[in-house]
């Protein structure tokens, strides 16, 4: 299942279509598997944990920031994700140079792509791939969202990632297409 506290999978195949800097990804992936925590310990002012399936993670807490990272033991696992409860009042802003100001109810890919000549509506594909842009194509995507709770969520990665915000009344879901997941949570007041 793609939704869970700690989940991972691997990409079986990837087809990337590129037209003048516009990208379209078609991935075939295995089903996501949940990682279950088996051991937790405090070490050097951090909380470290290990998964039953292998792999490990760490939570570090500093003033106004929580850094959470985890990795799978399998070298084949190259997609990791986390899900969080989405409150009815949650709103999501940011993610770099985006057309929309508020992103609740959408999946937003974080990948540099030519925006095209014109944009499609939220949730709709571009009318002519490579000429018109998908709604969330961006020359400057930034893997950081500011919420109204107040919280900031930053995926600390150079890899392709995705933010999913309460799609179909579902959870907040963050995915990094890499073998290491690093999330910085900024706490406001």
Tell where the protein language model's regions lie, with residue ranges.
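Catalytic and substrate-binding clefts that recognize carbohydrates or anionic sugar/phosphate headgroups
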Residues: 1-189
């Amino acid at each position: 299942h793609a939704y869970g506290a700690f989940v991972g999978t691997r990409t079986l195949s990837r087809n990337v279509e590129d037209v003048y800097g516009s990208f379209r990804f078609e991935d075939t992936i295995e089903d996501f598997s949940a990682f279950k925590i088996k051991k937790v310990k405090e070490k050097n002012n951090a909380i470290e944990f290990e998964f039953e399936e292998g792999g490990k993670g760490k939570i570090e807490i500093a003033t106004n920031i929580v850094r959470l990272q985890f990795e799978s033991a399998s070298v084949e696992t190259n997609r990791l994700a986390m899900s969080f409860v989405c409150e009815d009042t949650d709103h999501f802003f940011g993610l770099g140079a985006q057309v929309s100001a508020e992103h609740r109810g959408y999946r937003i890919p974080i990948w540099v792509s030519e925006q095209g000549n014109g944009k499609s509506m939220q949730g709709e594909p571009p009318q002519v791939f490579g000429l018109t842009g998908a709604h969330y194509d961006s020359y400057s995507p930034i893997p950081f969202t500011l919420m109204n709770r107040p919280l900031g969520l930053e995926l600390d990665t150079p890899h392709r990632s995705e933010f999913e915000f309460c799609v179909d009344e579902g959870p907040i879901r963050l995915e990094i297409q890499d073998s290491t997941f690093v999330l910085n949570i900024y706490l406001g007041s």
